């Protein structure tokens, strides 16, 4: 007899915050959401793997997920949880703290795996940071998202986004007011696209290199979803943030287009 799947119920606080995020994104830009998540996955267990291009990303993703009726628990940097007011709200909303570069990262992964296995949708940035790729394409990822999928047994849905970098600069809060004012005036198009689940069933978690191969597939899938969101910007973004550094050590070698 199959055990029925339980689903995490998002706190009212987080549902209200998602509505507020949708309103804020609508004030600062024009949100366009494409693609979707299958009905049987919408409420979990599920891993959403998203490219990271701006400090404004969490707000954009909260809004886009609200449009699609999804209430994800976000794996977020420990800095947010240490903030006096925001930290308390993050904890009460059920989000998961990640202190990068510390031993507690493994504990965060275990917490996230338990959350997914318990019926949650968990949103993770496989790159592990705001990407510094010269063309703003997804970087070579960390293996956390793949290991989370292996540990929980949940499917991974790639999510691509484009446009949030035109709202908040890389070094926010430095330059934040200027960026927000520019966004209110220009109202850039902010696009989010949900893709089809990534095929990982043929990979065995115990096989050497499996997590790295799975990570490559996840990043490839995010890249595939990002391509149609920036058709006129295949090599370099039109909007260039002068405060955003460039780094080539983690450039992801994308597979040739089919």
What annotation goes with each model-predicted range?
Residues 27-34, 103-106, 174-177:
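Short gly/ser/thr-rich secondary-structure transition/capping motifs
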Residues 135-206, 239-242:
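A cross-family acyltransferase "interaction/gating" segment
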Residues 40-102:
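Catalytic core of membrane glycerolipid acyltransferases/transacylases, capturing the structured
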Residues 230-255:
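Short, highly charged C-terminal tails/helix-capping segments
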Residues 64, 89, 114, 147-151:
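Hydrophobic/aromatic ligand-binding patch that stacks against planar heteroaromatic rings
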Residues 14, 21-52:
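Helix-to-loop junction immediately C-terminal to a conserved catalytic motif
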Residues 115-146:
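Catalytic-site beta-strand/loop segments enriched in glycine and acidic/polar residues
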């Amino acid at each position: 007899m199959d055990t029925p799947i339980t689903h995490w119920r998002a706190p009212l606080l987080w549902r209200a915050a998602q509505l507020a995020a949708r309103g804020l994104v609508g004030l600062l830009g024009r949100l366009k959401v494409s693609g979707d998540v299958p009905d049987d996955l919408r409420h979990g267990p599920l891993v959403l793997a998203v490219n990271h291009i701006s400090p404004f990303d969490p707000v954009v993703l909260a809004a886009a997920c609200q449009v699609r009726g999804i209430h994800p628990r976000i794996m977020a940097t420990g800095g947010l949880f240490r903030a006096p007011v925001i930290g308390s709200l993050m904890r009460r909303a059920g989000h998961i703290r990640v202190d990068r570069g510390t031993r507690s990262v493994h504990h965060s992964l275990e917490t996230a795996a338990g959350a997914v296995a318990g019926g949650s949708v968990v949103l993770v940035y496989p790159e592990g940071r705001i990407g510094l790729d010269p063309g703003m394409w997804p970087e070579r990822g960390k293996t956390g998202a793949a290991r989370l999928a292996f540990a929980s047994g949940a499917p991974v849905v790639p999510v691509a986004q484009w446009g949030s970098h035109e709202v908040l600069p890389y070094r926010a809060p430095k330059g934040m007011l200027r960026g927000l004012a520019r966004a209110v005036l220009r109202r850039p198009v902010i696009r989010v696209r949900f893709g089809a689940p990534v095929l990982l069933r043929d990979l065995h978690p115990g096989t050497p290199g499996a997590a790295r191969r799975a990570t490559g597939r996840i990043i490839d899938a995010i890249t595939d979803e990002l391509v149609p969101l920036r058709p006129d910007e295949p090599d370099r973004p039109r909007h260039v943030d002068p405060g955003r550094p460039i780094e080539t050590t983690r450039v992801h070698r994308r597979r040739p287009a089919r």
